C-alpha cells in the first residue's frame, strides 16, 4: 500500500514538473492573446485547452494558461516582438 502511494505521488510530481504556464502567444504576430474579462474566462480556457493546456484564464489583459506541455511556446517569443497585426 505504501509503495502504491509513493508511485502515485511521484506521478503527480512528474506531471507538475513537466508542464509549464505562461501567456498564450499568437505565432503569426508574436503577441499574446488579449482578453478583458479578468479571472475565469471561457475564451482563454478554450484557447488554453486547444494548446493542450489544463486551464486558462484572463490575467492582466492576456490569456494565461497553466499545464502547457514544455514544447508549447509562451509569450514573449525569443527574437520576435509583437507586431500588433
UniProtKB/Swiss-Prot annotation:
Range of residues in the leader sequence: 1-19
Entry GO CC: extracellular region
Gene3D superfamilies, per the entry: Knottin, scorpion toxin-like
InterPro entries registered for this protein in UniProt: LCN-type_CS_alpha_beta_dom, Scorpion_toxin-like, Scorpion_toxin-like_sf, Scorpion_toxinL, Scorpion_toxinL/defensin
Annotated localization: Secreted
Entry-annotated residues carrying Serine amide: 83
Source species taxonomy: Eukaryota, Metazoa, Ecdysozoa, Arthropoda, Chelicerata
GO biological process per UniProt: defense response
Species this protein is from: Centruroides limpidus (Mexican scorpion)
Entries under Pfam families matching the protein: Toxin_3 (PF00537)
Function according to Swiss-Prot or TrEMBL: Beta toxins bind voltage-independently at site-4 of sodium channels (Nav) and shift the voltage of activation toward more negative potentials thereby affecting sodium channel activation and promoting spontaneous and repetitive firing.
Alphabetized CDD domains for the sequence: neurotoxins_LC_scorpion
Protein name: Toxin Cll6
Stored PROSITE patterns: LCN_CSAB (PS51863)
Organ and tissue specificity: Expressed by the venom gland.
UniProt family annotation: Belongs to the long (4 C-C) scorpion toxin superfamily. Sodium channel inhibitor family. Beta subfamily.
SMART domains with a match to the protein in the record: Knot1
Keyword Disulfide bond: yes
Cysteine pairings via disulfide bonds: 31-82, 35-58, 44-63, 48-65
Amino acid at each position: 500500500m505504501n509503495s502504491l502511494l509513493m508511485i502515485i505521488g511521484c506521478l503527480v510530481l512528474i506531471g507538475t514538473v513537466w508542464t509549464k504556464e505562461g501567456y498564450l502567444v499568437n505565432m503569426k504576430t508574436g503577441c499574446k492573446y488579449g482578453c478583458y474579462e479578468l479571472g475565469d474566462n471561457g475564451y482563454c480556457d478554450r484557447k488554453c485547452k486547444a494548446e493542450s493546456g489544463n486551464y486558462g484564464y484572463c490575467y492582466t489583459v492576456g490569456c494565461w494558461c497553466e499545464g502547457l506541455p514544455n514544447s508549447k511556446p509562451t509569450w514573449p517569443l525569443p527574437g520576435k516582438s509583437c507586431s500588433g497585426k
